[in-house]
Amino acid sequence: AAVAAVGGAASLVGMKQAWDPLPSVLAGGFTTVDLASIKAGEPETFVWRGKPVFVLKKTAQMEQSPRDLTVGADRFIIAIGLCTHLGCIPAWAKDKWKCACHGGEYDSSAKQTFGPPPRPLDLPPFSVKGTVITLGEEGPEYTAIAATMKA
């Protein structure tokens, strides 16, 4: 009976390991971005879980928004780079993102300003540590910004 118990326990451990995601899969769920390297007014695109994510360091002339992430003295917008109309990837053009598919436009705060998009660009979950954000991890900054978007 003891041999059967040990064998049963060993098989349960093996089954659990098979069910758990591989470390490479877990690591693929997070992308880190150092905000210190981003130039003001020039958004950069990063890939998180196969989706483009726009990170824009705002210039002093760009409007303030409740969606702004403030790190030190700098303001940033973080948005999933897929048009909320049909999922095309908007391109940055002179202080706004323009979607070539159906003419949708988003301002520097990722808010829809023209065309068919039904809502602003989506906000990916993120956390902040110093000047580094981790996409895919919900931190207090994400929670606060997401709450303003629902209000």
Predicted regions and their residues:
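N-terminal secretory signal peptides and thylakoid transit peptides that target proteins
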Residues: A1-V3
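C-terminal segment of N-terminal export signals and the immediately downstream linker at the start
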Residues: V6-K51
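A broadly conserved sequence feature marking short terminus-proximal activation segments
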Residues: S37-V71
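Rieske [2Fe-2S] iron-sulfur-binding domain
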Residues: K57-A151
